């Protein structure tokens, strides 16, 4: 497919035939999620369901922008593949984790994160009222989870991720991605 050629990887093979360890590497997960998102949008269009507007969170922004024809498949394939590589390769070494805190006010979750003394935990995504994703290292997320439950969270769900996404730990990856996309726009 066009997306696979642009990314330099057989996305269908990666998604359906690779081992979990390979697919869960950020450099592979990013492009696989993009392909699935775009595939779902294509299926909806085939059923005559077309959005007037599209938006996305984090990686979802790339699918939304492609759906809106702001990116070509060639461009988004290259960009998202590089983005995943930057995220994986420029993340500092660490034992990272994320969790979703459910049933607690945003401000309370922020207070809970400030109480963490073993490692770090910070609110990463305010997903919807009553649900916030928190990123950090495993020790910080474990401590945050215990405090959140003690202070009234309905649930804390561990998220299967390889990094503390949406935190300052990915600043270098963000800078590299910005430079890459700026250079691509100049070409």
Question: Model features per residue range: what roles?
Answer:
Residues 5-7, 68-182:
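Alpha/beta catalytic cores of group-transfer enzymes, especially the acyltransferase/condensing modules
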Residues 1-111:
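FabD-like malonyl-/acyl-CoA
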Residues 183-187:
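A short, hydrophobic C-terminal helix/tail in secreted or cell-surface proteins
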